[in-house]
Curated annotation (Swiss-Prot):
One of its GO terms (cellular component) is cytoplasm. The UvrABC repair system catalyzes the recognition and processing of DNA lesions. UvrC both incises the 5' and 3' sides of the lesion. The N-terminal half is responsible for the 3' incision and the C-terminal half is responsible for the 5' incision. One of its GO terms (biological process) is nucleotide-excision repair. It comes from the Bacteria. This is UvrABC system protein C. Residues 16-94 form the GIY-YIG domain. GO terms for molecular function: DNA binding; excinuclease ABC activity. PROSITE patterns: GIY_YIG (PS50164), UVR (PS50151), UVRC (PS50165). Keywords: Cytoplasm, DNA damage, DNA excision, DNA repair, Excision nuclease, SOS response.
Amino acid sequence: MTDSFNATQFLKTVSSSAGVYRMYDAQGVVIYVGKAKDLKKRLSSYFRRNLPNVKTQALVSHIANIDVTLTPSETDALILENDYIKQYMPRYNVLLRDDKSYPYIFLSGHRHPRLAYHRGPQREKGHYFGPYPNGGAVRESLHLMQKLFPIRQCDDLYYKARSRPCLQYQIARCSAPCVGKISDEDYAEQVKLASLFLRGKDQQVIATLVGKMEQAAMDLNYEDAARYRDQISALRRVAEQQEVSSDSGDMDVIGAYYASGIACFHLLFIRNGKIFGSRSYYPSVPDETEVSEVLRAFMLQFYLNVDSQRTLPREIVVSHEFEDIHELEEAIAQASNRRLLIKTKVRSERASFLRIADANAKNAVETRLSHQNTVEERFLLLEEALEQSQAINRMECFDISHTMGESTVASCVVFNREGPSKGEYRRYNISGITPGDDYAAMKQAIGRRFDKIEADGKIPDILFIDGGMGQLRIAQKVVNEKFAHLDVAPTLIGVAKGEGRKPGLETLIYGENEVAFSLPADSGALHLIQHIRDESHRFAITGHRNKRQKTRNTSTLESIPGVGPKRRKALLQYLGGLQQVKGASVAQLSKVPGISLEMAQTIHDALRG
């Protein structure tokens, strides 16, 4: 693990509940996602002296942070783990785990829809139900549904080739829509029932099966009764994806926790009765503010936001009451044209979800407090190492990133006594300089940062420059000019890479007197400097790569006659990037909205010419 991560302190905050954990490296990238029945026991196993294999050792050596999400059951954790893996694509999951996606049941968008087993990208039009825990559960379900609903399960080529009913019709497993043995209306009704069943509306189906089982038993037909019993068990196993019952529907559940000046709202997004995902939010809370007041302000901003309206549930469950709940309901309804209920007093499954959300919020606050204590200790050590008479409350760090002078970007990251203040990070697109001139880039970036320092008022106590003496001198000169008329100015410190760029061997240089010094490799003060330096590097290189890719995409397509901004955007979005556009055939290009066959030929010839 990295020097900035205190495993002992972290494990004190971890619950023994089931859940999912995400491991991050020093650049803030998710490198591993896992699930556990007992999070504390599982995460503790990573920090034993004798790790089981080289891959685990490699993973642990890169851990800089861990986030956890509690879940009601291990099955929930399994599904959520898969969602996160698909979202983040962590490199150690690819190395250590079978990354096959979970299976789905697919209902096609055909005139006579078919039911099918599906695993992989969801490209075909239709409805996808799942994900399910394993392929066997899906196949059992399809086999059961074939008996409950006479919907075809053959592929479209087989369907189109039929001139008479197949064997499935003879054994009452299909209604033979291919040859008109059922009307379109009756078939559509069967499809509707099957769709309801797949959405969890299965109580009527179960009741029907129970009735058939009891009737078979009364008729002394024990073989059929046993078959119905097995079908009911299979149906319940498939529906077991979530412990919540099917009437929970779509809702957001908001747990809240507030302690030592930190508030956290943890949202569980419940869709179709299962946990679709979760997220924690940390609002800035003025002193002496009630949790209910902060909750109201958070909900107002979150649910009236345009992005949030696209996936609004019909119900929101919250842990605290506040005065104008009904007014907020009306405001959301007006903004989204959708009726929404906010509930505070809940029982049964909703109460269970609320307990999970509250537990996640509490766990998040305790983890952040633990992290803050570590950061605070390192700030004190840094003040001592730099012999600062005043407290260090704000630090900034600049870095420059480019590729052979192309698409130069400067970053400015901010740390306070709580750690990274990501909302204050800034990037500067550098222009008007000789490509590859890092000194000129640094001069421009710092000049722009402090151009309006009097109006801004946010003066860093320490300003770190990722670079050697040359960059530091340029930065010091700019700071002297910008702060000449002020009574205060930041202390500049250059962070020069050590021999072989090995962490712990950095040379630190005071800007004013150019005195070089170093700190012990195990110094908490040095770890804090490394953290802000690495963060500025990550932020700069991410911005540079995005700018470089955008520039290359635009410049390549700009030269093609008739391809303006709208068509460039359509090509890149539809096909997924410049390389995909270059590799596309004329037929594929012509499928892009706004691209005719003639224009597709022009683009194809230009890119291949």
